[in-house]
Amino acid sequence: KDRATVHHFLSPDEMAELIGNLAYEYEEEIVERILAEMDPRYAASILAEMHTDDAVDLLSNLDKEQIISYLSLMDEEQSQNIMHLLHYEESTAGSIMTTEFISIAENQTVGSAMKLVRKEAQDAELIYYIYVMDEKHKLTGVLSLRDLIVADDDTMVFELMNKQVYSVKVSDDQEEIARKMRDYDFIAMPVVDFQHHLVGIITFDDMIDVMYEI
């Protein structure tokens, strides 16, 4: 009854934050039980508001029929994005990455890049690192938000970016990634496909549990 009352007073994005915190603090089975008690459309709207990696974590424990049921109630872009991540093999970079990151083009000016950052910052899981891509969406560099803020608006991104950027492939094992992040003190790592296209990021928070196990 108390949970049902909470549902009525919180918006889907507020519930998404609450559910995400519960999943982090407690067993995901408890969160799945809470979702199951909700109206399916409301539960789907909560999953749609969550960061993709968190939504995938919860959905991956459900049976196929339940997954399809929730995805069918989301908008097409969101459901396809989650379905794509669900197809990656468990415990690989692809299965734990989030697609909510900020990327800019290397041929942009700092001024235009900052406009994009301001527009996308609210939905991004991490804004400290800004990843740079070429015209083929291949990862070519990285810079910090501070780099952008202190640079002149007319400076080109390719002049400012650090071209020595460490990345992992979608098929890399999560324990290998955790070791790299721990050894090099990274707070995030970009994930690329086999053509070096930037497809997601993995944050330090996502890897804490894995780091305790290695």
Locate predicted features:
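Hydrophobic packing positions in regular secondary-structure scaffolds
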Residues: 1-214
